[in-house]
């Protein structure tokens, strides 16, 4: 399993990337409610994914209310695809 990217393989980060892979962008509140995790947990995972170059963070204001949205980068999409391919290889491996 050494070929599985640990930044993706962590269950919560995998769920985040799966959600982002199906949309152009998602805001913090949507991810928070959908994943049912704490704000601190989500912030920590998003920071890790941003540092890996897998997500892009955009901070804006809607009126006076701050809004943070996230989208999958090209590198993030490619890494997620590579991750699935690695899982397929593991799944189809035959003993012996």
What are these regions (language model features)?
Residues 1, 18, 74, 78-96:
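Amphipathic alpha-helical dimerization/coiled-coil segments
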Residues 41:
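Residues in the helix-turn-helix
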Residues 46-47:
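Short, hydrophobic-biased segments on the C-terminal half of alpha helices
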Residues 53:
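Glycine-centered, phosphate/nucleic-acid-interacting loop/turn motifs that mediate DNA/RNA or nucleotide
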